[in-house]
């Protein structure tokens, strides 16, 4: 049974984690989901990646890790970012394409990365991952392409920190 983990800043007081889990169950009924954390500080992408990077090695290879933290792009034409799917150390990661990958992977490794745009015009109350999951045709459906994403985004990460 495939395993999927969730790391979000949704918190636990509102229905949002249940909404995400319901969407996942509807889309991937045979997958088991586990929570890494839903108490990431609001909008703290760096904290979210740190928590995920610390936890993922304890899960079996082949696990899919979803990371969704509140954010918006500065691009006025499309304020909702694309997501990237990354194959790294035997795990799969789906996270916003916000320059976070260099924080997740070691410098000497070249992960496989594929970018997927958010294809809905009005994301559901800011929960872009919910909408992206509905539009996405399957986590392993398309072959991932080798790229040099890590080197390309080093300057952006240094600027963030």
Residue map of PLM features:
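Active-site histidine-anchored catalytic micro-motif
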Residues: 3, 27-34, 43-51, 60-69, ...
